[in-house]
Amino acid sequence: MSVLYPSLEDLKVGQVIQAQGRASPTMPTLPAPMASAPPLSELYPNLAELESYMGLSLSSQEVQKNLTQIPDSDNMVVTSPGPGQVVAPVSGNNLGILRAEIKPGVREIHLCKDERGKTGLRLQAVDKGLFVQLVQANTPASLVGLRFGDQILQIDGCDCAGWNTHKAHKVLKKASAEKIVMVIRDRPFQRTVTMHKDSSGQVGFSIKKGKIVSVVKGSSAARNGLLTNHYVCEVNGQNVIGLKDKKVTEILTTAGDVITLTIIPTVIYEHMIKRLSPLLLHHTMDHSIPDT
């Protein structure tokens, strides 16, 4: 299994650091005059060339904040990341990446109903599966962490495969108000793309009514494989479905230098939200920033 990186920029910087570590000269066997040890800041490569190639607004000092410090030792050993390990010399321990993570496997949640007998959840059948269509803000569904696009595998021990939307809502209506047990798979139709702003604060894409319509050549968006004809579901884990483009742009502007988008193909998205009013999406969808 290969080492994993959140973005192409992380991969390139990581490769430079590893290459420099491998190229470090070994200590001579015969005694020699000891030169003064270089400061830790010089143990990592000069990133001027890399900055020019990627258009990143980053310095060696900024990268080093996200790297493990090398101990002061005469027997320094440069280690390579293990298979499957996520290495992020540029992104670091970014909260947006953590909030947007689509976890593999399935999980169980316990849902209840509010005083009106509502869960705050709407479901939609897609390709014989059952998916979360709407999570209303400040409801039991939002409190347990359900998100748009999550797949519902079971409700109270009953397999949901093949159910239509009407049956799903009927089962929820009849379920206990105190405890509804669901088995969930995280957003199988969605994927995340992590990008880095350039010196002008741009990552290189534009949207129209929530859909990605263009990607700038040579930008971080292009380098990291962002595609057109996809809708933006989340920015750094925050749901933006139903928001005006101006508001989404504001969220992107204030989101920091590392941006993680959660996107979904247009054909799936439009099927998921059919018969939902744009006003309902805008005013009732949970747009809060999730906990990590």
Swiss-Prot record:
InterPro entries: APP-Binding (IPR051230), PDZ (IPR001478), PDZ_sf (IPR036034). Transmembrane segments: none annotated. Its main location: cytoplasm. The keyword Oxidoreductase does not apply. SMART domains: PDZ. It comes from the Eukaryota. The two PDZ domains mediate the interaction with phosphatidylinositol 4,5-bisphosphate (PIP2) and target SDCBP2 to the plasma membranes and nucleoli, PIP2-rich regions. This is Syntenin-2. It comes from Mus musculus (Mouse).
